[in-house]
Amino acid sequence: MHILITSGGTSEAIDSVRSITNHSTGSLGKILAETALAKGYQVTLITTPTALKPDPHPHLRLLLVKNVEELLTQMKTEVPQHQVLIHAMAVSDYTPVYMTGLEEVEKAQDLHTFIHRENQEAKISSKEEYQVLFLKKNPKIISLVKEWNPAIQLIGFKLLVDVSSEELIQVARESLV
């Protein structure tokens, strides 16, 4: 059986030195991969450069991604080739579109113009007292998996913070495919 596992957390670049990321360590994905390898399965692990990784193994294929765009490209290729997907990666919900000083935003007639702009500098200047960052929603990759491989067994994870046990159960039931 070929198992695809995702782990770690994506990071979305604001400019060449800044990014939006999360605190995912990849430890769950590492443990899942090690367990599957110990049981004799072929494992493809899609993970991030900073995530914890299992030791090299003859049945382990490691693919590195940094952001949602790279993850989407890898998943489109890999999902059809696997029987099981354990999607344990913390995927960025948003990606930066444009960052500018508050004064420029205040002068704008129409805020929609900012969502069609891109920063031209490799590093955005830090001289402004306040910056405004425009973000765009990323695609929900887990919702595309069954389009790429309707037969795949899909296991997903969702982090919720400060919610009751009842809400956890409700969200889990709503997530069942």
Predicted regions and their residues:
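A cross-family phosphate/adenosyl-ligand binding-site feature
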Residues: 1-177
